[in-house]
Each structure stands twice: as C-alpha cells, then as structure tokens.
Design a protein with these regions (language model features):
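Surface-exposed cleft-lining segments at the edges of enzyme active sites
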Residues: 90-95, 119-133, 160-166
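Conserved, mostly hydrophobic/aromatic
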Residues: 155
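Short glycine/threonine-rich loop-to-helix capping motif typified by GTGT followed
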Residues: 132-133, 164-174, 197-208
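Acidic/histidine-enriched active-site and ligand-binding environments that engage anionic O-linkages
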Residues: 152
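Alpha/beta catalytic barrel-like cores
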Residues: 1-116, 124-126, 176, 180, ...
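Short, amphipathic alpha-helical segments
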Residues: 97-104, 112, 129-137, 167, ...
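Alpha-helical scaffolding segments of alpha/beta enzyme cores, especially the outer helices
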Residues: 105-108, 134-148, 171-180, 204
C-alpha cells in the first residue's frame, strides 16, 4: 500500500487516475474497494483461509466493525498483518528485511485489534549459505518477538523462481529452517515457502510440531504451473 502501487490497483478495479484530489482520498477509495471484496457473499472462510492486511487497513472499519474483527467474526477468515518495511539491498545473494523500529508498538496494537498473525518477506536470490542463513536467522529472530507478543508469525523466506541454482538454495533453506524450528521451544510459527524443485522437500516441515501451517508461495509461476507443482 503505497502512493506508487495504489493508483495502479485502483485503475485495474476501474477507478481512473485523477478520481481523487489527494492521497487521503485515494486511500479512502482503496479501502472502499477492499471493503466491497470483504463484504461480498463469495468471500467467506469456506474458500478464503486468511487475509493479509496493511496497518492502515487494520486501523479502519468494514461495515462499521474494525477490519480484523469483521474478517474473523463475520466471515470466519483469519486476519494477518503485514509488519515488514520492505527489503534491504541485495548482499551475498539475499535480501533481508529493512529495520522495523516500531515493531513492538505495532504488535501490541494488532493484538488489541484481534489480529491472529503477521506476514513479513525476505528474498533469496542464489544458493549462498551465508546469505540464506542471514535471511532465516532474521525471520526467526523477529518471529520469536511476534510470538512473545501473542501473535503467530508467517515466516516467509522466498526463493526467487528465476534463481539459477534454485534447487541448491532450497536444500540449504530447508536445513536452516529445520534447525531454527528445532530450537523454538514452545513457540509456534507458520511457513510461506516458494514451490520447490524437489517434490515433498518441505514435508518434514509440514509435520513439525512447531509449525501451525505451511502456505505455498507461487512466486511468479503461472497458476497452471503453480497448481502442477
């Protein structure tokens, strides 16, 4: 949700650029679009497991009800909050997340608003052991803080589908994730993982006691290819 991406999203929805006078009006239009989606009779927990919210969306109302409460209480859809501030520049074949100086206050607010979990994304571009280790360590380090705040983090170390050594990167990643999961104690996490080259690579993670659920990340594959994988 930014001044750059929102006009494009509104344009695809049918609201022409220039239909608003300032950024506040633009975000009001965006929330009206999101509200219409959430209030649709087709949008229920039968087909939609969870919805990821921006902070601004969490702070607003849908049909007079705070967004997260509306999702869970009216629609049986689990609300998650995007907490990361974007990606740092690529170093050693990977992009860790930028610092999140206001994370603790944000988590406290989210907990008070009925949010179940969080979403934060890093990207792995090549099979660099040290780069992948940094990504996974940061994800779990922040994930533990999120657990301590009473929420369930979605750990998302995306592997770029165009990485030339994708299979090798995924093998390294799988090992690093296992090590972190084994060290978690009594905290539980979710995982969001790029569809892998090796079938059932992440089967042990799906079965792991500390993992609530594993979400498939299509990462740019076509729907047909993603479903095949």
């Amino acid at each position: 949700q930014s001044g750059g991406s929102t006009p494009k999203a509104l344009g695809l929805y049918g609201v022409a650029d220039g239909s608003w006078t300032d950024e506040e009006e633009m975000f009001d239009l965006m929330h009206a679009m999101r509200s219409r989606i959430m209030m649709s009779s087709a949008f229920t927990g039968e087909r939609v497991l969870g919805a990821i919210l921006f902070e601004m969306t969490m702070d607003r109302l849908v049909d007079g009800v705070p967004t997260a409460s509306y999702l869970w209480q009216r629609k049986n859809v689990v609300p998650f909050l995007k907490v990361d501030k974007g990606l740092a520049d690529q170093v050693d074949g990977a992009q860790v997340m930028k610092p999140m100086p206001d994370l603790d206050a944000l988590l406290e607010k989210a907990n008070g608003r009925g949010v179940f979990g969080t979403k934060m994304r890093s990207v792995i571009k090549s099979a660099s052991e040290s780069g992948i280790a940094r990504v996974v360590e940061q994800q779990f380090e922040i994930g533990k803080r999120i657990c301590a705040a009473g929420l369930v983090p979605i750990i998302e170390p995306e592997v770029d589908i165009n990485a030339p050594d994708k299979a090798e990167a995924e093998a390294i990643l799988a090992g690093q994730i296992t090590a972190q999961l084994d060290a978690l104690g009594d905290q539980n996490v979710m995982l969001k993982l790029t569809l892998p080259e090796q079938t059932n690579l992440y089967a042990p993670h799906i079965a792991h006691d500390r993992v609530v659920r594993v979400v498939a990340l299509s990462g740019g594959y076509s729907r047909e290819e993603a479903n095949r994988r």
